[in-house]
From Swiss-Prot:
Gene3D superfamilies: Aldolase class I
Name of protein: Nitronate monooxygenase
Matches recorded under PANTHER family: NITRONATE MONOOXYGENASE-RELATED
Residues that coordinate or bind FMN: P22, M23, A24, A238, G239, G240, G261, T262
UniProt similarity note: Belongs to the nitronate monooxygenase family. NMO class I subfamily.
Record keywords, A-Z: Flavoprotein, FMN, Monooxygenase, Oxidoreductase
Amino acid sequence: MRSQIQSFLKTFEVRYPIIQAPMAGASTLELAATVTRLGGIGSIPMGSLSEKCDAIETQLENFDELVGDSGRIVNLNFFAHKEPRSGRADVNEEWLKKYDKIYGKAGIEFDKKELKLLYPSFRSIVDPQHPTVRLLKNLKPKIVSFHFGLPHEAVIESLQASDIKIFVTVTNLQEFQQAYESKLDGVVLQGWEAGGHRGNFKANDVEDGQLKTLDLVSTIVDYIDSASISNPPFIIAAGGIHDDESIKELLQFNIAAVQLGTVWLPSSQATISPEHLKMFQSPKSDTMMTAAISGRNLRTISTPFLRDLHQSSPLASIPDYPLPYDSFKSLANDAKQSGKGPQYSAFLAGSNYHKSWKDTRSTEEIFSILVQDL
């Protein structure tokens, strides 16, 4: 495969092949704007906003102000998951009973009667004239990306017609082939090491090959070469990348760029808790992958509560994403409000989080360390 870096830099008008991962719940506009100002591509998580046009527009206007430029070198990231299945009311009810017991054991009052749908899915948008699609075409961010699957074909084509590049997260060769057949502009190859939610098209795939980032990149590049694909989408590597050496190792495959998330979490421009920050500064625990928190596999730093929740939650007993996230987020918040501390929280991070603390909370200094030899 021919090197994609120069084409990537020219297409997106950036100095470095660096994308900041969206990281819903931890990232901020300030973080995204700083990465863009420094010559990379900042990302704004939009998972909860696909039906909220005013909020999308406000976020992007505020981003422009922080960057001091209206070029909109930014990645707006949406979720394209399958909506929760109908006919699982009994599973949802048993999950609420499970949380009633957890609350009782913690000494906190439980009053939740149903699981709320925290995140709409962009997949439900099928009309290119939908207000959100029309707004995005007007706003013209450089990239609109999707996690958990592909949006509707007509929506992809409509956005691309306005010169917006469409990216999607993939975790294996089959998903890459789907993305290629859908004529996407870029694919984020998410390795098993990545923190946060696993981007599988199929939720909690029991046949997930769990390919590490290096192996996934090698697999896809080999496929591109063997299939004689002359104009592949931009290939972005993600997962476990924590320093300039790990970046250079992946760029040797001639891919376009890398996407980093966990390395930014200790920054003062991320919104992690003091307890989460301490885990970076003095790492003691491994990470774990579990679907019991949100309904989809995600990687978090392991804690006794999270291990117990995972071990006591067979996949068949877990409601569909994102329903369990409602009960989990409520518990984490209620525990803090009740003075129980952070023991019922999640601490999302990649498997190399213990290598991610750079002895600084400055985004600028972290960025400088990452690109020093690129």
